[in-house]
Amino acid sequence: MSDTPATTFGGRGAIPPNNSNAAGVDLPTEDLQGLVPRGVSLKDYLNVTAVHLFKERWDSNKIVHHTDKFDNNKLIVRRGQTFYIQIDFNRPYDPRKDLFRVEYVIGRYPQENKGTYIPVPVVTELQSGKWGAKVIMNEDRSVRLSVQSSPECIVGKFRMYVAVWTPYGILRTQRDPETDTYILFNPWCEEDAVYLDDEKEREEYVLNDIGGIFHGDFNDIKSRSWSYGQFEDGILDACLFVMDKAEMDLSGRGNPIKVSRVGSAMVNAKDDEGVLVGSWDNVYAYGIPPSAWTGSVDILLEYRSSETPVRYGQCWVLAGVFNTFLRCLGIPARVITNYSSAHDNDANLQMDIFLEEDGSVSFKLTKDSVWNYHCWNEAWMTRPDLPVGFGGWQAVDSTPQENSDGMYRCGPASVQAVKHGHVCFQFDAPFVLGEVNSDLVYITAKKDGTHVVENVDATHIGKLIVTKEIGGDGMQDITDTYKFQEGQEEERLALETALMYGAKKTLNTEGMVKSSSDVDMNFDVENAVLGKDFRVTITFQNNSSNLYTILAYLSGNITFYTGVSKKEFKTESFEVTLDPLSLEKKEVLIRAGEYMSYLLEQGLLHFFVTARINETRVVLAKQKAIVLTIPKVTIKVRGTAMVGSDMVVTVEFTNPLKETLKNVWLHLEGPGVMRPKRKMFREIRPNATVQWEEVCQPWVSGHRKLNASMTSDSLRHVYGELDLQIRRRPTV
């Protein structure tokens, strides 16, 4: 133990940290100056009898502030925009002699200079960017106010009071939970740091509570639906709890840079008891496999109720939950998938693949890993801490990969800064650059201890970067927002800029992008279905008038989606003779029995093919990952697809394998249609079908979606979805 005494503040009169939205101390109902004379009753002065917040879903406050989708009976408004309240008094309000104001308080130690105590004066005209309240109706004993909040206001849940002045001091309404008011970021307000000027983008990146996340491999792109559910009951409070759990000072909660950085640390539980425990080892004891989750709602509600991390998540689950957190608070956000994503252990913009002298991959020496895909988030905001031009989309990553300022977090990193090589600007831009723009270097490890660079592939990493398209389920290619095309002058300048600002590059790969060879090699993998045999075809093209003999080596591996190999299940060496200007093909049969017993949950197989031309000693190298085609869950509905009407949902799954599936779980949910549910089946025999029925009553109209998943001991990553159009209930 350290002998250094703990720091104390007793003699300084310091105010303790104000870092909990949930904590609070009620303001006094009477704040009097001196004694009240005998015979004087304070009730004779102006007194508040009721406060009306117009907080129902159909009221103008929620409609105009785009918060009517929240399943929450409190007033929810967005900062920098006016909203309406009505105050009823014990007598008519006379502005010539009566004085009152509205007060908003957040946290336990409210201070006006910290933005945690907000006195809102009644003014004749509202001023842009400032708190104020204007009387727009004064009839009988009621006053209606147009209240304007600051576009820099703290985001959170405020307690509301009305204070009235008397000759003897202030009378204040009692604390009433019914008048609590949530204030969120406002992408519709030009003065807000998260302002987004395109309405379709706002509808997608703030208001859409259903999304799609892309996974699989560049050569075999898959997508799955994800229920963000940011408007579901309890989710807003759960997101505020995440910041409380981080002990984030309330005064910083109006800054989207700080909020998103705290969120990137708190969505993972690596070092701060955050939301999700990450697990990449295919063992999920005492928890739920990452592939079983169908959305964020269950995860956040469980975290809020238990106040302990939820087990388990991987990158797409973390990104889905982080997206819910950001959209719920009002920060425009989207999930990004980077195919062939580099995890560069030594941050040198270089992924080293070591080969043995016979051309096989040395898994012992190869430490860097190329993830088949990696998901992170982008959040939209201005960056006043950076030079002009680096605002807009910021990369934020909650997957715990590397330590940043003492915690596992990443970002916000300006996507524009990453593209142009300005990696000196905070936060974590060098790491993001490495993920999307490293070189893949093949190195032969000689027996004498020397290393020989055989080939450099400058296009493999960051092969494709995508997100869900606006207004649909398709894919939008955003690769060019992160990097210039390989070979362009701008790409070379961006890399030089990154090196100038401190990015490392162990090997000068300029001019080494492709080994000079008269022979081209490629290979294709036919459509591979889980539990079936398939073929790999390697093609050699001789572009010269020379005769060549080639020694080739194929390695098939069961891999985690992170690129880490679990088991080499197939090896095959073969020789090829290439006549001048000829083409030769070699087929390798992959039998189901060779891979099924080792298979991991995402059904990923990774193939390396290396070949050495005996006459020139040139080494050719290619790698490719495939995703086995996995059966889907089927969802059907019957009944009336109308708000408030019973609808029966049926989930079906047929086991296509020759083995019995054990410990089967089906998960089902749909924001606005049904709460998350799950059901267990002890086993499903080969070719057998299980059915599960649930009755629900939709409460949100319009386009909705049901998501389902199936997980078992030996088969996972099985999904299904169903689009619905829910009608409004006719008005009587």
Curated annotation (Swiss-Prot):
| Organism field | Rattus norvegicus
The family database entries (SUPFAM superfamilies) matched by this protein are listed as: Cysteine proteinases, E set domains, Transglutaminase, two C-terminal domains
Keyword entries, A-Z: Acetylation, Acyltransferase, Blood coagulation, Calcium, Cytoplasm, Glycoprotein, Hemostasis, Metal-binding, Secreted, Transferase, Zymogen
InterPro entries tied to this protein: Ig-like_fold, Ig_E-set, Papain-like_cys_pep_sf, Transglutaminase, Transglutaminase-like, Transglutaminase-like_sf, Transglutaminase_animal, Transglutaminase_AS
| PROSITE patterns given in the database record | TRANSGLUTAMINASES (PS00547)
Q: Which reaction does it catalyse?
A: L-glutaminyl-[protein] + L-lysyl-[protein] = [protein]-L-lysyl-N(6)-5-L-glutamyl-[protein] + NH4(+)
Q: What is this protein called?
A: Coagulation factor XIII A chain
User: According to the UniProt entry, which residues carry N-acetylserine?
Assistant: S2
**Catalytic residues per the record?**
C315, H374, D397
Return the Gene3D superfamilies for the record: Immunoglobulins, Transglutaminase-like
Q: What is its EC number?
A: 2.3.2.13
Cofactor names from the entry are: Ca(2+)
Described purpose of this protein according to its UniProt entry: Factor XIII is activated by thrombin and calcium ion to a transglutaminase that catalyzes the formation of gamma-glutamyl-epsilon-lysine cross-links between fibrin chains, thus stabilizing the fibrin clot. Also cross-link alpha-2-plasmin inhibitor, or fibronectin, to the alpha chains of fibrin.
This protein's encoding gene: F13a1
